[in-house]
């Protein structure tokens, strides 16, 4: 058994907390709101984010960060990428000296160009080998329901990766390990942008052929960027790359795809957020960061560029898709 703290009681944070608890570990979930913590403790549910999914007895909740982090050997950060730095700044003094810190956030800081694992190491003042990334084709609702799924635990320190792997392995949840943190994070961040493009195409009324084209060419541009930055090509073909991309680009449970679909139907950013319970999709936040990273690396990412144009430059979704098809022909 391993003491686990999960910081963030949204749908994915709560789901990951459930998986760790189902694996036999005592888990404390930090929630921002009293009513969420009370629901978890009194009713063994997080009705606000996971509906009627029953949570295990080994999972408790608190609104006190220090209490959640006390004694935790594994600290899971489940807050959005855009708030990770500020939240972690107030939590770092409570993190145990040798705890393994796991990032669930998929994003790149626009101001710094840093990946989330880099932000964590910087803010927490820890070595990069203490930071792991959990990523893969993991739609929260399906995992919370106990549907079979696999994930990737990426960490520079293979021993830590295997430690987390052992702690999070549940009957329905199979974790694999990797030391390619960079590749896992680039894939996870970029797939949110590609999923927006897939949703935009669906909102324009295009079908399976278009979706498959977006997925395939999206993987191609993601791979170009990742390899240029030094990632392992195998990561792009695995759970963090192709696996996560397919799930996010095809499922109606995907926030990014749903958000993109509203954009494709003609909604603006604010109106599109209604499709995702008022939350702006991570891909909207990340697309400019990915674009900036690609330009700095000298990598062409036309689908990412198209998403930026739709989200921030008032470009017509249909015109942008036609422009993509009209690009200079070349070998695959």
From Swiss-Prot:
It catalyses: sn-glycerol 3-phosphate + NAD(+) = dihydroxyacetone phosphate + NADH + H(+); sn-glycerol 3-phosphate + NADP(+) = dihydroxyacetone phosphate + NADPH + H(+). The active site is at residue 191. It comes from Corynebacterium urealyticum (strain ATCC 43042 / DSM 7109). One of its GO terms (cellular component) is cytosol. Gene3D superfamilies: N-(1-d-carboxylethyl)-l-norvaline Dehydrogenase, domain 2, NAD(P)-binding Rossmann-like Domain. Its EC number is 1.1.1.94. PANTHER family: GLYCEROL-3-PHOSPHATE DEHYDROGENASE, GLYCEROL-3-PHOSPHATE DEHYDROGENASE [NAD(+)] 2, CHLOROPLASTIC. It is an enzyme of class 1 (oxidoreductase). Sn-glycerol 3-phosphate binds at residues 106, 136, 191, 244, 254-256. NADPH binds at residues 11-12, 32-33, 106, 140, 255, 280, 282. Pathway: Membrane lipid metabolism; glycerophospholipid metabolism. NCBIfam families: PRK00094.1-2, PRK00094.1-4. One of its GO terms (biological process) is carbohydrate metabolic process. The keyword Nucleotide-binding applies. HAMAP family: NAD_Glyc3P_dehydrog (MF_00394). Belongs to the NAD-dependent glycerol-3-phosphate dehydrogenase family. Pfam families: NAD_Gly3P_dh_C (PF07479), NAD_Gly3P_dh_N (PF01210). This is Glycerol-3-phosphate dehydrogenase [NAD(P)+]. Keywords: Cytoplasm, Lipid biosynthesis, Lipid metabolism, NAD, NADP, Nucleotide-binding, Oxidoreductase, Phospholipid biosynthesis, Phospholipid metabolism. Catalyzes the reduction of the glycolytic intermediate dihydroxyacetone phosphate (DHAP) to sn-glycerol 3-phosphate (G3P), the key precursor for phospholipid synthesis. It comes from the Bacteria.
């Amino acid at each position: 058994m391993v003491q686990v703290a999960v910081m963030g009681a949204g749908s994915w944070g709560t789901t990951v907390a459930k998986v760790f608890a189902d694996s036999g570990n005592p888990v404390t979930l930090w929630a921002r709101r009293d009513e969420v913590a009370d629901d978890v403790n009194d009713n063994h549910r997080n009705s606000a984010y996971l509906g009627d999914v029953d949570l295990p007895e080994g999972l408790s909740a608190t609104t006190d960060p220090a209490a959640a982090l006390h004694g935790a050997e594994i600290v899971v950060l489940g807050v959005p990428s855009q708030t990770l730095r500020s939240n972690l700044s107030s939590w770092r003094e409570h993190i145990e000296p040798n705890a393994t810190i796991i990032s669930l956030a998929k994003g790149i800081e626009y101001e710094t160009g840093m990946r989330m694992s880099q932000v964590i190491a910087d803010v927490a003042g820890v070595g990069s080998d203490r930071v792991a990334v959990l990523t893969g084709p993991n739609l929260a609702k399906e995992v919370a329901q106990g549907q079979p799924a696999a994930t990737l635990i990426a960490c520079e320190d293979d021993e830590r990766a295997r430690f987390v792997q052992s702690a999070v392995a549940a009957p329905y949840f199979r974790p694999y390990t990797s030391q390619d943190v960079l590749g896992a994070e680039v894939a996870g961040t970029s797939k949110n942008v590609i999923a927006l493009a897939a949703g935009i195409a669906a909102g324009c009324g295009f079908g399976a052929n278009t979706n498959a084209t977006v997925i395939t060419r999206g993987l191609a541009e993601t791979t170009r960027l990742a390899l240029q930055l030094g990632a392992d090509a195998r990561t792009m073909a695995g759970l963090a790359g192709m696996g996560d991309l397919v799930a996010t680009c095809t499922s109606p449970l995907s926030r990014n795809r749903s958000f993109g679909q509203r954009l494709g139907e003609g909604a603006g950013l604010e109106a599109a957020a209604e499709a995702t319970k008022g939350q702006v999709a991570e891909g909207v936040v990340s697309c400019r960061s990915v674009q900036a990273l690609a330009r700095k690396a000298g990598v062409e990412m036309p689908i990412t560029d198209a998403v930026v144009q739709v989200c921030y430059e008032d470009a017509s979704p249909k015109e942008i898709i036609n422009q993509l098809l009209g690009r200079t022909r070349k070998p695959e």
